Curated annotation (Swiss-Prot):
Highest taxon above the source species: Bacteria
Record-level Gene Ontology MF annotations: structural constituent of ribosome
Name the UniProt record assigns to this protein: Small ribosomal subunit protein uS2
Name of one Pfam family that matches: Ribosomal_S2
High-level lineage: Bacteria, Bacillati, Actinomycetota, Actinomycetes, Bifidobacteriales
Biased composition (Low complexity): 255-275
BP GO terms, sorted: translation
Similarity remark: Belongs to the universal ribosomal protein uS2 family.
């Protein structure tokens, strides 16, 4: 179960939706009320959906699956990159390139090209046999590829699941995932269609603190799944054949489980208590 409280969510401003005129009627079931022309999300229902998404991601990773973290909007880029890196999962925080999943073979070739360029010493003009201009162009190519594909450089196959921030922004990523039958967990605001993803999390997808909170939580689910996976390997006697990576050992020793809290908040609190102002549109 996810380690998150109602207070955490309120402080992060996750209850603020979009302006009422911009809502998607399919989000009605997750909306508590409206205040000053802004829809207020029912965080009790959000908690239920968070638990479902958390358990799904944990189970997926425990069964040797990978989760691709996706969030290219400015508010999400840092959280997506940091949290995915923390649990050694692939991510896309810059522009989603068409075919990243559906044309994975071609994308893999570009990743291999990136790795080749990273082996070069761009300061060694004499040893390379290239001119300074040629080396400069190759270095620029490397930087461009790293920006586009650096987050998926170690993704050797299409992911088992995807976590997305803002499905209205990442429509192409969600479409490609569905074409390949990849389940999607996503933060879904009041202007989006929750039916387009398997595990919608009704919440504000614009507040930086909210995005950081939920992305960190999904990364925690990955970490828990990795620990469960390593425990299963030991039980099956596979530990000697498949030794744990250094970063997995670090998770075991340094990742202290957060204490669960069953804090309850009245709906009135969900309408008023927050540290962030509603979205200006």
């Amino acid at each position: 179960m996810a380690q998150i409280t109602m207070s955490d969510m309120l402080k992060a401003g996750l209850h603020f939706g979009h302006q009422t005129r911009r809502w998607n009627p399919k989000m009605k079931q997750f909306i508590l009320t409206q205040r000053n022309g802004i829809h207020i999300i029912n965080l009790f229902k959000s908690l239920d959906m968070i638990d479902k998404a958390y358990d799904f991601i944990k189970t997926t990773v425990a069964h040797n699956g990978t989760v691709l973290f996706v969030g290219t909007k400015k508010q999400a880029q840092e959280a997506i990159a940091n949290q995915a890196t923390r649990v050694n999962m692939p991510y896309v925080s810059e522009r989603w390139l068409g075919g990243m999943l559906t044309n994975f073979q071609t994308v893999s070739k570009r990743v291999n090209r990136l790795k080749e360029l990273e082996e070069m010493d761009f300061t060694d003009v004499h040893g390379s046999g290239l001119t300074k201009k040629e080396l400069l162009l190759l270095e620029r190519e490397k930087d461009k590829l790293n920006k586009q594909l650096g987050g998926i450089r170690n993704m050797n196959r299409t992911p088992s699941a995807m976590f997305v921030v803002d499905i209205t922004k990442e429509t192409l990523a969600v479409e490609e995932a569905h074409k390949l039958g990849i389940p999607v967990v996503a933060i879904v605001d009041t202007n989006a269609d929750p039916d387009t993803v398997e595990y919608p999390i009704p919440a504000n997808d614009d507040a930086i603190r909210g995005i950081e909170l939920l992305t960190s939580l999904m990364a925690d689910a990955v970490a828990e799944g990795l620990l469960e996976r390593s425990g299963a390997n030991k039980t099956e006697g596979e530990a000697a054949e498949q030794p744990m990576a250094a970063w997995e050992k670090e998770l075991l020793t340094n990742e202290a489980p957060a204490e669960a809290s069953a804090e309850a908040a009245a709906p009135a609190a969900a309408e008023g208590e927050t540290a962030e102002a509603p979205k200006a549109e």
